Amino acid sequence: MTNATIMPLTPVIGGEIEGIDLATPISDAEASFIRQALLDHHVVFLRNQALDHEQHKAVGNLFGELVKVPFVESVPCHPEIFEIIKLPEERDVYNFGGNWHTDMTYMQEPALVSILYGAEVPTSGGDTMFASLEDSYDALSSGMQQLLEGLTGVHTADRSYGKAGKFASDTIADEGMDVRPSEDAAKQIEHPVVRTHPETGRKALYVNPNFTFHFKDMSEDEKNKLFKQN
C-alpha cells in the first residue's frame, strides 16, 4: 500500500505525483505506483525532491539497468549521470537538447526512460516540453497509419555528435557542456517507425527530427516531406 497520489496535468500527457520521497528507500508499492503512473501519463513529475547522485541512480534502477549516455562526459564516479548546463553567457548559443527529440534512438537498444533532476532551474522560462507520440499516432488517418506501419526509420547521432556535427563547431558547442564528438556517432541503427508498447499494447510513432536520418529505401527529402505532413 502507498499513500501516493497523482494529478493529471493535461488530458493526454503528464502527471504530478505527491506522497513519495525519492531520497528515502522506495517501497515495492511506491515503485509499482511510479511505473504505472509513467505508463498512464507518459511523463511524471515529483516536486521538491532533494537527491544526491546515488539516490538519483536508485530511482533509475526501478526501471532496469542504468546506461551511460555516449558522446557526453559524465559526472565523475557516476558514468550514468551527466549534467545539462546552460551558463548565463551562453544565452545565444545552441541549446543542448533544445529541439524535439526522443533520447538515444540512435542506440540499438534505446533507454526505457530518462530521469531529469532539476538541481538549479530559472524562476521563469527554460521550459522542457514533452509530447505524446502515442496520441500523435492515434490522431493520424487510418491510411497514414497503414503507410507508416510499413516503414523503417534509420537513426544516427552523426548530425549532433559526429566529427562534423553540431557540437564539433566552436560556435555551437556550449561551454558548460562537455560534449565529445566521435566517429562512432556515424553508426546507423534501424527501428520501426511505429512501435507497440509491450506492456500497454498502444502504438506510437518512433521518429524524431534530431536522430531519424531517413526512412529505409527513401531519401532524406522524402522523409522530411512525410514529417511535415504529420
Residues covered by each model-derived region:
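Non-heme Fe(II) oxygenase catalytic core, chiefly the N-lobe of the double-stranded beta-helix
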Residues: T2-N230
